């Protein structure tokens, strides 16, 4: 089974596009200060998405220095509202944790020999795409192991993933209130700031490699 970027990266890129669409939708109604804020948000989303994409495709180093065949397994991190997939990689007496974008093959991955090239991570024909830099210490929170026996990969729809990634957006109204207070805006400014903040929080969860499992 081959895993291309279409499967692992489609969801975060769709959320990125949706976030930029929300930002663009408020441009016609923005005054000069609001327009400047929207421009900053839009540029930040584009820049950070490009950086994460660079990590995923090996353009930027993730800090994973081992090469060749190494022992690895998948663990799922659960910390507060954060859920991410990590590859726990053993190389000699050293262990590191590499975050990766979720794809269904991760849910059934049993301890195996991973092939590292310095720019990519493979399990046979399946490629895993890094969603951040490697850690040399165990990720914070609860780490859940995969089942010891492989099963059919689960299917998680976009709706489920959006619902999970929307959880951090509960703080968006506070951003809206702060914007109204600082900029002396009205109801329209509050609604605009709240929706942009909610979209941005959702995007940040997705682009950091959220795990719907």
What are these regions (language model features)?
Residues 1-61, 157-213:
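Alpha-helical transmembrane spans
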Residues 62-82:
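Structural detector for short beta-strands of small beta-barrel domains
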Residues 69-71, 97, 113:
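Well-ordered beta-strand positions in beta-sheet-rich domains
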Residues 80-101:
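OB-fold (S1/OB) nucleic-acid-binding surfaces
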Residues 104-155:
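A membrane-cytosol interface segment of integral membrane proteins
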């Amino acid at each position: 089974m081959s895993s291309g970027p279409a499967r692992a990266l489609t969801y975060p890129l769709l959320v990125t596009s949706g976030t930029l669409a929300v930002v663009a939708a408020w441009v016609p109604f923005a005054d000069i200060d609001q327009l400047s804020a929207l421009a900053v948000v839009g540029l930040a989303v584009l820049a950070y998405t490009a950086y994460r994409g660079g990590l995923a495709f090996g353009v930027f180093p993730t800090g994973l220095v081992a090469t060749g065949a190494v022992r690895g397994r998948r663990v799922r991190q659960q910390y507060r509202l954060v859920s991410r997939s990590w590859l726990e990689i053993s190389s000699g007496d050293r262990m590191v944790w590499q975050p990766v974008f979720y794809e269904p093959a991760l849910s059934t991955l049993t301890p195996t020999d991973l092939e590292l090239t310095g720019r990519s991570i493979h399990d046979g024909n399946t490629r895993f795409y890094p969603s951040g830099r490697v850690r040399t210490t165990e990720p914070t929170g609860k780490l859940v192991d995969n089942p010891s026996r492989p099963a059919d990969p689960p299917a998680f729809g976009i709706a489920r993933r959006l619902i999970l990634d929307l959880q951090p957006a509960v703080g968006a109204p506070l951003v809206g209130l702060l914007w109204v207070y600082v900029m002396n805006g009205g109801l329209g400014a509050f609604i605009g700031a709240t929706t942009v903040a909610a979209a941005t929080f959702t995007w940040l969860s997705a682009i950091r490699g959220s795990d719907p499992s």
